[in-house]
Amino acid sequence: MTNKIIQMLEAEQMNKEIPTFAPGDTVVVQVKVKEGDRQRLQAFEGVVIAKRNRGLNSAFTVRKISSGVGVERTFQTYSPLVDSLSVKRRGDVRKAKLYYLRDLSGKAARIKEKLS
């Protein structure tokens, strides 16, 4: 059981508006990237294959195929490096963790779109 003071401090830091998303959804994550003295936004678009809800320590993993190679990236939900998160498409899946997508390729790795 966490301390009440820790809960209060974490609640203060969780002030970011995060849209509702689930595994199977296609999301676009805008990430702040620092190159030398410049800072820019980089978009990372892919399918959410895992989500971890732990308050301030929440995280999610996004997978995409980049020039034939699978790329996975785990983001801390409330990280200051994550600028924005938008849901492009809702996926209809039955599992909470979609790690089986790592072994699939091509059309087999597609996810059905959720209707409604």
From Swiss-Prot:
Keywords, ordered alphabetically: Ribonucleoprotein, Ribosomal protein
Disulphide bridges: none
Family assignment from sequence similarity: Belongs to the bacterial ribosomal protein bL19 family.
Alphabetized InterPro entries for the sequence: Ribosomal_bL19 (IPR001857), Ribosomal_bL19_CS (IPR018257), Ribosomal_bL19_sf (IPR038657), Translation_prot_SH3-like_sf (IPR008991)
HAMAP family: Ribosomal_bL19
Pfam families per record: Ribosomal_L19
PROSITE patterns assigned: RIBOSOMAL_L19 (PS01015)
Role of this protein: This protein is located at the 30S-50S ribosomal subunit interface and may play a role in the structure and function of the aminoacyl-tRNA binding site.
Biological processes annotated in GO: translation
The protein, known as: Large ribosomal subunit protein bL19
Lineage top rank: taxon: Bacteria
Record-level GO cellular component terms: cytosolic large ribosomal subunit
Any one Gene Ontology molecular-function term assigned to this protein's record: structural constituent of ribosome
